[in-house]
């Protein structure tokens, strides 16, 4: 009997040592955070179902929300300690993501307003394309920055621009290929197809980079409120990969198909980490 009592006492001590007791206020705070999280995740999954493009930021944001929810659940179950500062950080992140999901700002620059063949400098972008980018930057300010500032009047905010460039399968002119190779920090394959693919990947990246920098410049000229910074754009060069079009692309898909010469742009605003 004495041995049994000692056994139960040890079990109680071990259980207590592995549990983190919560106050009523802490439990209420966790419940409220979970409600916001569940709503934000449902809204993010809904926009993914409408815009299932794998290059968009929504899947990453949904994964981030699920990771936060998993951690909050562990805290609520007493498996990890409650941290007020961490909960405050999570709340800011979740509300920021939710605002972006509710007010998406994105564009696709098609071939009609895009760069000419082999071109990538912003000075070579059409005036219609530049006007579209200025309108895109204005939408970020009006639809995202101002709304997040209303939620967090004193917090620093960060604007994140994400650009994804594409190219077709057409070989480049010799003069452009030589000019492009001068700036590369890697050797160019001698085999024609591999060479073309590498140069088109570099071309698509430079187009995305030019567009991202132009949008950043426009945003910085438009933003007048304090504590708002524009991060360095996140640029991707997809080369000859087929852009997601929302529907299956059936062959023949011509090498010079105009649907391949595009750039996708996404804007998001978040509470800046401290």
Predicted regions and their residues:
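N-terminal targeting segments with Sec-dependent signals, encompassing both cleavable signal peptides
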Residues: 1-274
